[in-house]
């Protein structure tokens, strides 16, 4: 079985140029009445990497609200800004308490008598200026304790400020460590190793028209209680004339039957049956080329290492849904284990037998389904693999024959008629 048999079944590239074909009537109705044009796709509500394409503006009291929830703000901001914020917090606290100690020394007269009078006892030893007071503040808050500068019992206010600075330093340290640990332990980055296919496909599955997309896990650690859900987002005008720019409609992926809960060890194809309850029930292949909607897909579960919930998101525009395609197989059995080849994860192949009409027309018997034994690419790969194994076994068996036995085998092979059934295509079997 040669590779030339699969040439009619093209592989679709995952790269999209952001444009799609639309149709419009021809001039004066001549010709086939269709002129192919290109128009720009709608803006995404959810980007392919899962980020929401939303910008908030004109928010009242935004800074005050963010400061009131300081911990969440520190966890959500970027690392560079968080480290800069804590560095500024430490620097401001050192400068503030350094200024306080300098003022205490100035009021007590420590700066006027740096060491000339042996009977004079300063509030803080070896603090003769602002720089020395600043260094004493750093040593106090960080508990370095070089030993040259220390507070005496001469000034109770200085002793009290040492206690206050120690407490403030502990609060800043605790807040910083907690924010850093919370930011590092967030399961958000776990979504970087959860993969969605670049395209969704529409094809027949068990005699029903279905929308399918593929999800995969790049890590060997499992996603516990993994489940999927999807929503269709498109503009809608209500019966009262109200325009809803982003109307969200749930897409059933088997919630009632428990099919939305998956065991994500190898890549899995998520399936949505296009039936009477589906928002895609009346959409045909031609409608898909001109329609304006977006399907947001969500994968949720708990990280096995931390038991924290993570969520991975992606979306498919109408131009990214391939009608009449199926995903290439990625799971193969090799020796005593299964092998997942992610080089085929995003690739699809065309299924010409897929009806072009909508599921609604299909239910109303407006389209005659092809034979259920139509050619299948996965079966072709399986047959190729089986035939190669059989050819290897046959070749090894022929090599073991003696010259006399080989001559007898060639003579019998030339006289015995071959079984024609073994040379028919799968669609004829």
From Swiss-Prot:
Its main location: membrane. K(+) 4 binds at residues 145-146. The chain crosses the membrane at residues 77-103, 156-183. GO terms for molecular function: identical protein binding; inward rectifier potassium channel activity. K(+) 1 binds at residue 143. The keyword Transmembrane helix applies. Residues 1-76, 184-429 are cytoplasmic. One of its GO terms (biological process) is potassium ion transport. A 1,2-diacyl-sn-glycero-3-phospho-(1D-myo-inositol-4,5-bisphosphate) binds at residues 78, 80, 183, 188. Activated by phosphatidylinositol 4,5-bisphosphate (PtdIns(4,5)P2). PtdIns(4,5)P2 binding to the cytoplasmic side of the channel triggers a conformation change leading to channel opening. Keywords: Cell membrane, Disulfide bond, Ion channel, Ion transport, Membrane, Potassium, Potassium transport, Transmembrane, Transmembrane helix, Transport, Voltage-gated channel. It comes from the Eukaryota. Residues 386-407 are annotated as: Disordered. A motif (Selectivity filter) lies at residues 143-148. Coiled coil: none annotated. It is a multi-pass membrane protein. Residues 395-407 have a biased composition (Basic and acidic residues). K(+) 2 binds at residues 143-144. K(+) 3 binds at residues 144-145. InterPro entries: Ig_E-set, IRK_C, K_chnl_inward-rec_Kir, K_chnl_inward-rec_Kir2.2, K_chnl_inward-rec_Kir_cyto, K_chnl_inward-rec_Kir_N, Kir_TM. Residues 104-129, 147-155 are extracellular. Belongs to the inward rectifier-type potassium channel family. Homotetramer. Inward rectifying potassium channel that probably participates in controlling the resting membrane potential in electrically excitable cells. Probably participates in establishing action potential waveform and excitability of neuronal and muscle tissues. Inward rectifier potassium channels are characterized by a greater tendency to allow potassium to flow into the cell rather than out of it. Their voltage dependence is regulated by the concentration of extracellular potassium; as external potassium is raised, the voltage range of the channel opening shifts to more positive voltages. This is ATP-sensitive inward rectifier potassium channel 12. It comes from Gallus gallus.
